[in-house]
Amino acid sequence: MNEASKLFMADFDRRPYVPGDARLVVSPENARERLGRFIRGARKQLLIYDPRVSDDAMLRLIAERIKAGVDVRIMGQVEGKWNVKSERHPGKRLHIRAIIRDGKRAFLGSQSLRRLELDKRREIGVIITDEIVVREMLDVFEKDWAKTDSGKKRAKKAAKAERKEEKLAAAS
């Protein structure tokens, strides 16, 4: 909170701001570098809420994570040329910007993964390391995802596999 206050006062007084807390993500000062590092750090799963992902460098990193076998799920819109699958949020309007990494860390802020919001506008976010908060964010994402077309297909496939296992167990 102290670091956010320093940022506010620097902006209010029209003074330059130099980020001091590694968990604070501030555009345009450090958002591209910190969010890039955050995305690159995903080993198993990357769950993204973002109304409009269009930054080429960030999409390149996301595509690399997909190639590396990371389960990447994006709720929002993704620029089509990248062929990165996404789902519409099942609610009325998606406004949140959040990324949940490997169920252990999360980013929550006002930055979309768009060039304008990473490089030009004053936007602020935070890297969350509190396991309880991250778990709650993960649970909300999973509930939202279950309502999407992909989520419904995944649930149907899992139910079919479960029935098959039950039949095999009953036959033996």
Predicted regions and their residues:
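PLD/PLD-like phosphodiesterase catalytic module centered on the HKD motif
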Residues: M1-R32, G41-S172
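Acidic, amphipathic alpha-helical patches
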Residues: L35
